[in-house]
């Protein structure tokens, strides 16, 4: 019989984006952390920016949960492991509660986590009650804890909102409209946590405001069942992977880096903006981020541009995602028209747009196997390169992203979720494919890997083999 773990948990959702879910989730996390509790926070969907804020608020790593990209079993593993160490689990939803396929509501219902609805009360009175009732009753089998009003003006305003609730809906309180606790944003979402010098001040202020006006007792405990756990094969044993990490390149999934380590890789981090050379590495990973905000500085670091060109010329593996791909192009032009010449390994140019260019989950059939991920960008790229593959959106979202390849270099707008297919990822990073995958194109744990060399990483390893 699988073991059961119990932990108080709640999913923070809203009728739409921009209601203040992240502010409320971060405030709850910081409040309970300040009271001495261990808080684990998760984020629904593929977002990178909200987890950075939530990590600062909780003091613990934040991972994504998604019934499609992450998968049911891997989501179950992450929650079960958190329940074994935490006093409280918080899950921040994505978009509106019922938006998307799968939605935040789908995840809450599947794992039995009650929903706390956050509604922006600005310029609203009795209509608040109608929105709250809709969130609670639209899907009758959805566990619903109650509602919290955000951006409330006065005590009288809060009383009007509370008085609008019907059918026994629970009122969790009101968070005031204070600029000191709001989190600033830009074109891809919230500003990165590392760029906010006063972030801890904002988080503590939000926690104090929440404590003074809202119900903040621990929610009821939720049962979390143990997942089916497989073992990671050491397909990257001893492989040294250099990972770009600075204010221009910060969009990495914690679960993806965990997987690389579990497969035996040794990770080292470097800054394409400040460092003049790459770390000693067999392979290179350029994740997404905000290169458009730093493209002039990136262009001026000619030593790093030369080092990356040399890495590719040596026939070493290189994976570049979204902003990492833009860095490899001939040039990048920002919305103000400032053009900077970059690495030049991919023949083409990119221009930033003021409007969204693509937003979609992506399923990509690569030569190495099927990988899942997502795309979200404001740039348009022009190139004559022929893609080796194109992504498909499982729910009709905007974007059928190309994947380009030159030698051992693979580049795409897609942010890949590595645990969706570990052996495909290993093939992308392995320095010598012949040695790494000789006689084991379809490896199995029992047939290939000695038991003493295995390490647990979770049920996500059920993914397709190349």
What residue spans do the PLM features occupy?
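Phosphate-binding active sites in nucleotide-utilizing proteins
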Residues: 239-313
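Cysteine-nucleophile active-site neighborhood
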Residues: 267, 291-367
């Amino acid at each position: 019989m699988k073991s059961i773990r119990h932990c108080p948990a709640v999913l923070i959702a809203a009728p739409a984006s921009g209601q203040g879910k992240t502010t409320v989730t971060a405030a709850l996390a910081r409040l309970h952390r300040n009271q001495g509790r261990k808080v684990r926070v998760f984020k629904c969907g593929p977002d990178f920016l909200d987890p950075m804020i939530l990590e600062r608020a909780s003091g613990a790593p934040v991972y994504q949960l998604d019934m499609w990209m992450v998968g049911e079993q891997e989501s179950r593993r992450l929650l079960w492991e958190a329940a074994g160490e935490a006093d409280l689990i918080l899950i921040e939803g994505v978009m509106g509660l019922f938006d998307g396929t799968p939605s935040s509501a789908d995840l809450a219902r599947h794992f039995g986590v009650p929903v706390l609805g956050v509604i922006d009360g600005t310029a609203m009175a009795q209509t608040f009650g109608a929105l709250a009732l809709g969130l609670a009753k639209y899907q009758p089998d959805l566990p619903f804890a109650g509602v919290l009003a955000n951006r409330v003006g006065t005590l009288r305003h809060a009383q009007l909102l509370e008085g609008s609730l019907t059918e026994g809906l629970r009122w969790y309180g009101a968070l005031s409209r204070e600029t000191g606790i709001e989190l600033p944003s830009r074109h891809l979402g919230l500003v990165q946590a590392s760029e906010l010098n006063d972030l801890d001040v904002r988080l503590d202020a939000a926690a104090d405001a929440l404590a003074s006006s809202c119900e903040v007792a621990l929610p009821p405990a939720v049962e979390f069942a143990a997942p089916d756990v497989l073992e990671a094969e050491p397909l990257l044993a001893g492989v040294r992977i250099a990972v770009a990490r600075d204010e221009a390149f910060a969009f990495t999934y914690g679960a993806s880096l965990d997987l690389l380590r579990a497969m035996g890789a040794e990770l080292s981090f470097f800054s394409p903006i400040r460092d003049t050379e790459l770390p000693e590495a067999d392979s290179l990973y350029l994740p997404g981020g905000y290169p458009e905000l730093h493209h002039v500085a990136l262009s001026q670091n000619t030593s790093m541009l030369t080092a990356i060109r040399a890495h590719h010329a040596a026939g070493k593996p290189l994976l570049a995602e979204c902003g990492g791909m833009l860095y490899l192009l001939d040039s990048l032009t920002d919305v103000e028209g400032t053009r900077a010449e970059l690495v030049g390994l991919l023949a083409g140019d990119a221009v930033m747009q003021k409007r969204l260019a693509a937003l979609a989950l992506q399923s990509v059939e690569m030569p190495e196997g099927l990988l899942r991920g997502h795309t979200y960008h404001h740039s348009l790229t022009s190139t004559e390169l022929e893609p080796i593959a194109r992504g498909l959106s499982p729910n009709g979202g905007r974007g059928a992203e190309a994947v380009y390849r030159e030698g051992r270099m693979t580049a795409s707008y897609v942010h890949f979720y590595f645990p969706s297919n570990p052996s495909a990822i290993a093939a992308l990073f392995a320095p010598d494919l012949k040695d790494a995958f000789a006689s084991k194109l379809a490896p199995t744990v029992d047939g290939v890997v000695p038991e003493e060399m295995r390490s647990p990483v979770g049920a996500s390893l059920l993914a397709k083999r190349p």
